[in-house]
Amino acid sequence: MHCESPIVRRKSRQIMVGNVPVGGGAPISVQSMTNTETTDVAATVEQIRRIQTAGADIVRVSVPTMEAAEAFGLIRKQVNIPLVADIHFDYRIALRVADLGVDCLRINPGNIGREKRIKAVVDKARDLNIPIRIGVNAGSLEKDLQKKYGEPTPDALVESALRHVEILDGLNFYNFKVSVKASDIFMAVAAYRKLAALIEQPLHLGITEAGGLRAGTVKSAIGLGALLMDGIGDTIRVSLAADPVEEIKVGWDMLRSLKIRSKGVNFIACPSCSRQNFDVIKTMNDLELRVEDITVPLDVAVIGCVVNGPGEAKEADLGLAGGTPSNLIYIDGEPSQKLTNENLVDNLERLIRAKAAQKQAQLEADAKNIIARA
């Protein structure tokens, strides 16, 4: 019932964002961006920690002013996850946060200014071994490109990116990644596909300003999913008008669904119908909240009846197939025990945690054996 992923990753250079490798065959990293006032250090630190707990590899922070830059320095001292500073308009802010411990600088070609200013940022980044993201956005293209193309197009996005790739190449600076974001799915996908064939730098994927939690998730899943299935992309950010924690959850769900990278419990659940022997929807909602702290990859099937229940349950690490008078639990493909509907969620949580602990212990033992044989 399981099909191996046919995805072949695009080859790219590798950069390091803090201790996280991006590109060069490294696992695709998941990131989000804070939406607090950066000058509110306590609130921003608290949000970064929640984002990290949700599974983020990297967090971006907007730094619009010098006051925010000083706050960024205080934030940097209080968190232990790689931080990207999002810089627009004033290149001097980039120079300042570089001295304050930033792990990556995001600059926007559409508003960062003349090549002289870019060179100043590059020189500072080179001295401190800080990578840069060239972040092209359809909503803020350079004025000459707006005039040339009349409106944002995939070619306009790519031309903007290549213009700044050429500048950095000319400065013998290769420690950078690139993004070409648009809110239009077709525009973004076309731009990324074209750019992926033209450069060897790692690509940061995103559908910008995708929308609220539901619509934004759908748009991002379609756009990023298409690119990821092509093997394009080295780090992703799902842009949602929602709690940044939700961006991390959706990002991980995408990677998990495409069998690119796994973390936590992957639920396989039926949509439910009148054949269900227990309330599938309520059971799922409760379980997802209860076990979201589990990080070990684990497939759990929750199927309400005997039509597809046994088949799906056998394929999972742990599966529940609804039945009358009792539901049947499968562990590693074998029938294990029966559960009634009484305290069903409590019992399922207990079994899931036990299986996760067993799998974690096995992973650790395997890792030790590999080290011992090396």
Swiss-Prot record:
Residues binding [4Fe-4S] cluster, per UniProt: C270, C273, C305, E312
Pathway(s) it belongs to: Isoprenoid biosynthesis; isopentenyl diphosphate biosynthesis via DXP pathway; isopentenyl diphosphate from 1-deoxy-D-xylulose 5-phosphate: step 5/6
Cofactor details (free text): Binds 1 [4Fe-4S] cluster.
Catalyzed chemical reaction(s): (2E)-4-hydroxy-3-methylbut-2-enyl diphosphate + oxidized [flavodoxin] + H2O + 2 H(+) = 2-C-methyl-D-erythritol 2,4-cyclic diphosphate + reduced [flavodoxin]
GO molecular function, one term: 4-hydroxy-3-methylbut-2-en-1-yl diphosphate synthase activity (ferredoxin)
Superkingdom of this protein's organism: Bacteria
Keyword terms: 4Fe-4S, Iron, Iron-sulfur, Isoprene biosynthesis, Metal-binding, Oxidoreductase
EC numbers, comma separated: 1.17.7.3
Top EC class, one word: oxidoreductase
InterPro entries in alphabetical order: Dihydropteroate_synth-like_sf (IPR011005), IspG_bac (IPR016425), IspG_bac-typ (IPR004588), NO2/SO3_Rdtase_4Fe4S_sf (IPR045854)
Cofactor(s) needed for function: [4Fe-4S] cluster
GO biological process: isopentenyl diphosphate biosynthetic process, methylerythritol 4-phosphate pathway; terpenoid biosynthetic process
Signal peptide segment: none
Pfam families tied to this protein: GcpE
HAMAP family associated with the record: IspG (MF_00159)
Protein function: Converts 2C-methyl-D-erythritol 2,4-cyclodiphosphate (ME-2,4cPP) into 1-hydroxy-2-methyl-2-(E)-butenyl 4-diphosphate.
Assigned protein family: Belongs to the IspG family.
Official protein name in the record: 4-hydroxy-3-methylbut-2-en-1-yl diphosphate synthase (flavodoxin)
Gene: ispG
